[in-house]
Amino acid sequence: MVMISNVSSRFWAKVMQGTAPGACWLWVGAIGADGYGRFWVKDPESEAGEKMWRAHRYAATLTFGSDEVEAAKMVTHLCDNPLCVRAETGPESHLFLGDHSENMRERAARGRDNLHGLAFLRRSRAERAADSRALRERVLKHALRLCPGGLTPLLEAPAAVSGYQP
């Protein structure tokens, strides 16, 4: 169980919390070319020995439980911020559970259709890593402008997280 606790602590250490009420909790760890956060967890059942989670999906699993997340299939952002991991059990949550068709309707209604295609697959690992670092830097600068009080590290799980560990 100590390992599980360390995984949760490692996850929340990569989250910055906006100080304004209702602000996003931004993932500042690894970021994929699609703009979503990535988080790796050891998984002995995986061929690679670890499993990659999207950061918002991992946060939702910690908060809502794996059965609910698996049943819903999709974790959708109300805030339209792919780096937001603010999953809470109350109305202040920025993430909600839904199905694929609901997620596609929301995405189209908000004009967030994927226009960049799969060009990132043709880039080297070093190029993708450099892009990730540059994107993270731009996101943090933008977030600091959007959050009047700035950002503070969220070093531990929010009170709403029940202690469930995937």
Role assignments for model-derived ranges:
Residues G49-Y164:
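Short, cationic Gly/His-enriched loop motifs
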Residues M1-M52, C79-D80, A134, R145-P166:
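Short helix-coil boundary/hinge micro-motifs
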